[in-house]
C-alpha cells in the first residue's frame, strides 16, 4: 500500500514538473516569438551543416565535412606569403560556382584582381570593400551578414583592422588593447546573425611573437583571444619548401593543419602545392591522394589507373590528368567516395587547367 502511494506521488510530481515546463515554454514563446525555444530532436530535426570547398581536395577531406562550414566563423593564419589569401580566393571561386554571393573586405588594400581571376573568381560578381578603419570594416561585415543575401565574407586581415582611435592619434601613441576590444565586441555582435543567415565569415590573420616565452611556442595571432574562441575552424597554413622547374622556383609546397574544428575531429594535416599565378595544383593532389587511397597504383616511377598507365614520374602523370579530364573526375570521385564525400558541383574542364 505504501509502495503504491509512493508511485502515485512520483507520478504527481512528474505531472507537476511537466505542467510547469509547458507554462515556462509558453511564456518564452509569448515573449520572444514562436521558434525561440524548441526540442532539438523534435518534428523538424536540425539541418546538416553545409560546406564550401576550399579548392583543395585533401583539405576538404581533412576538414571532415567536405570543406569549410557555412554559418560559422573561420580563422586562417600563418606567416607571410604562406598562401592564406590564395586559399580564401579558392573558397570564393567554389562558392560562386554554387551561385552564392561573396564579399571581400580588403583591410590590407592588397588584393590583386588579376590573380583572383586566374584562380577562378568572377570579378563581376565579387563585392569588394577597402575600409579606412577597423570599426568601418566590421560594420560593413555585420551589415552584409544581416542582409541574409551574402554566402561568404572574407576579411583580409585582422592585423590590418586599425581602431579609429589609433588612426586619429599621433604616431607612437599607446592604444593598448584597442584592437582586441574591437574584435571582442565584433564577435559578440556577429555570432548570432552569422548563424541565422547561414553566411560564413573567414578572417585571415597574421602571426606575432610573444616576448619572453621560455617554454612552448612563442607564436600567437593578433587581435586578442576572442576570435580563437568564436571560430569553429582554425587553419594554420605554412610554406614547407619550394617547387622548382630546373633552377626556377615556380611555386611553394604548403602544409595546412586543422588546429581547431567544432564540426569534425581536429589536428589533421594535409600537404599540397601552390603554383605561382595558378593557385592550388588540383592534379598534383589527385595523383598523391589517389595513391594513398589505392585508386592510383604506383610501381617504381610508373603511375597507373586500372589497366592504363598514366605516366612515368609525377609530372607526366599530372600532365596526363590535365589532358584527360574525364579520367581525372573518375579518380576524384573515387577518392571522395572512399572518404564519404560527394561532388558539390559538376566540375568543368577549366578546373584542371594549369598553364
UniProtKB/Swiss-Prot annotation:
InterPro entries given for it?
AAA+_ATPase, DNA_recomb/repair_RecA, DNA_recomb/repair_RecA_CS, P-loop_NTPase, RecA-like_C, RecA-like_N, RecA_ATP-bd, RecA_C_sf
Domain of life per record:
Bacteria
One of the GO BP terms on file: DNA repair
Which keywords annotate this record? ATP-binding, Cytoplasm, DNA damage, DNA recombination, DNA repair, DNA-binding, Nucleotide-binding, SOS response
Q: Name one GO molecular function term.
A: ATP binding
Quote the record's binding site residues for ATP: 78-85
The protein's job, in short, is:
Can catalyze the hydrolysis of ATP in the presence of single-stranded DNA, the ATP-dependent uptake of single-stranded DNA by duplex DNA, and the ATP-dependent hybridization of homologous single-stranded DNAs. It interacts with LexA causing its activation and leading to its autocatalytic cleavage.
Please give the family membership noted in the entry. Answer: Belongs to the RecA family.
Q: Which NCBIfam families is this protein grouped with?
A: tigrfam_recA
Question: What name has this protein been given in UniProt?
Answer: Protein RecA
Which gene produces this protein?
A: recA
Amino acid at each position: 500500500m505504501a509502495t503504491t502511494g509512493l508511485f502515485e506521488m512520483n507520478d504527481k510530481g512528474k505531472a507537476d514538473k511537466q505542467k510547469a515546463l509547458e507554462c515556462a515554454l509558453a511564456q518564452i514563446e509569448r515573449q520572444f516569438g514562436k521558434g525561440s525555444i524548441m526540442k532539438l530532436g523534435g518534428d523538424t530535426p536540425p539541418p546538416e551543416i553545409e560546406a564550401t570547398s576550399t579548392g583543395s581536395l585533401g583539405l576538404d577531406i581533412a576538414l571532415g565535412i567536405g570543406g569549410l562550414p557555412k554559418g560559422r566563423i573561420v580563422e586562417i593564419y600563418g606567416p607571410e606569403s604562406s598562401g592564406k589569401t590564395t586559399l580564401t580566393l579558392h573558397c570564393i571561386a567554389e562558392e560562386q560556382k554554387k551561385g552564392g554571393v561573396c564579399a571581400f573586405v580588403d583591410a590590407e588594400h592588397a588584393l590583386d584582381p588579376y590573380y583572383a581571376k586566374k584562380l577562378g573568381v568572377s570579378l563581376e560578381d565579387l563585392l569588394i570593400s577597402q575600409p579606412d578603419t577597423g570599426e568601418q570594416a566590421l560594420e560593413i561585415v555585420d551589415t552584409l551578414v544581416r542582409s541574409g543575401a551574402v554566402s561568404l565574407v572574407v576579411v583580409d586581415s585582422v592585423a590590418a583592422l586599425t581602431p579609429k582611435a589609433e588612426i586619429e592619434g599621433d604616431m607612437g601613441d599607446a592604444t593598448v588593447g584597442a584592437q582586441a576590444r574591437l574584435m571582442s565586441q565584433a564577435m559578440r555582435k556577429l555570432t548570432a546573425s552569422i548563424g541565422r543567415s547561414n553566411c560564413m565569415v573567414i578572417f585571415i590573420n597574421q602571426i606575432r611573437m610573444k616576448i619572453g616565452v621560455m617554454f612552448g611556442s612563442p607564436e600567437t595571432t593578433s587581435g586578442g583571444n576572442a576570435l580563437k574562441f568564436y571560430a569553429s575552424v582554425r587553419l594554420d597554413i605554412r610554406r614547407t619548401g619550394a617547387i622548382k622547374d630546373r633552377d626556377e622556383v615556380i611555386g611553394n609546397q604548403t602544409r595546412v593543419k586543422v588546429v581547431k574544428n567544432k564540426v569534425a575531429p581536429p589536428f589533421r594535416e594535409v600537404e599540397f602545392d601552390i603554383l605561382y599565378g595558378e593557385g592550388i595544383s588540383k592534379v598534383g593532389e589527385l595523383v598523391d591522394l589517389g595513391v594513398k587511397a589505392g585508386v592510383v597504383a604506383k610501381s617504381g616511377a610508373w603511375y597507373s589507373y586500372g589497366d592504363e598507365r598514366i605516366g612515368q614520374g609525377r609530372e607526366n602523370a599530372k600532365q596526363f590528368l590535365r589532358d584527360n579530364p574525364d579520367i581525372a573526375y573518375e579518380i576524384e570521385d573515387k577518392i571522395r567516395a572512399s572518404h564519404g564525400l560527394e561532388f558539390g558541383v559538376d566540375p568543368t574542364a577549366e578546373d584542371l587547367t594549369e598553364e
